[in-house]
């Protein structure tokens, strides 16, 4: 019915980077079916991608000479986090919502919270290479080279070959 049509069209909009239209379609589903997990997840993803796009455009916007860098707007990801939390309320083992939430925490500078959320992801599924990779990068950021090395090695074993280059570059003891 309508739900499938909105899901398909919303997903197409998402792939075409037409985030506002995707958000409209996923929101239309949620008006009728507030617990539709796919619509909730895709709505949160669309918001996150839209914010990332806005931020990337903002980064390329010419600034007035001497303008303070602090003038750059801080993205508020609270709606995105709320969307992923709503997914987890419906299905507490929905690992993709947790994974995306961890990435949002990292983008938002909430490093410890991101690491803990990646820990939850890996407790649910020990074979998500990207979770090891991303957590490994956060460990590098926090100066925990041994933990970073272990995570990046695991990511490499699971198929992210570039993880080995990161180890060579950042995890060597000086």
Question: Each predicted region: which residue ranges?
Answer:
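Residue-level recognition of tetratricopeptide repeat
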Residues: 2, 36, 94, 128, ...
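TPR alpha-solenoid repeat register
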Residues: 5, 39, 97, 131, ...
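Canonical tetratricopeptide repeat
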Residues: 8, 42, 100, 134, ...
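Short coil/linker segments at helix-helix boundaries
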Residues: 49-82
């Amino acid at each position: 019915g309508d739900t499938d049509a909105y899901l398909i069209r919303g997903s197409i909009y998402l792939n075409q980077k037409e985030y506002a239209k995707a958000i409209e379609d996923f929101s239309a589903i949620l008006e009728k079916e507030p617990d539709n997990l796919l619509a909730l997840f895709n709505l949160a993803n669309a918001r996150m991608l839209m914010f990332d796009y806005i931020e990337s455009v903002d980064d390329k916007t010419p600034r007035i000479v001497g303008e303070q860098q602090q003038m750059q707007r801080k993205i508020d990801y609270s709606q995105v986090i709320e969307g992923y939390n709503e997914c987890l309320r419906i299905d507490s083992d929905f690992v993709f919502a947790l994974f995306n939430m961890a990435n949002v925490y990292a983008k938002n500078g909430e490093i410890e919270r991101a690491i803990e959320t990646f820990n939850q992801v890996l407790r649910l599924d020990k074979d998500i290479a990207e979770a090891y990779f991303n957590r490994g990068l956060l460990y590098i950021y926090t100066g925990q080279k041994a933990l970073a090395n272990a995570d990046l090695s695991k990511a490499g074993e699971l198929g992210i070959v570039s993880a080995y280059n990161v180890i060579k570059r950042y995890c060597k003891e000086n």
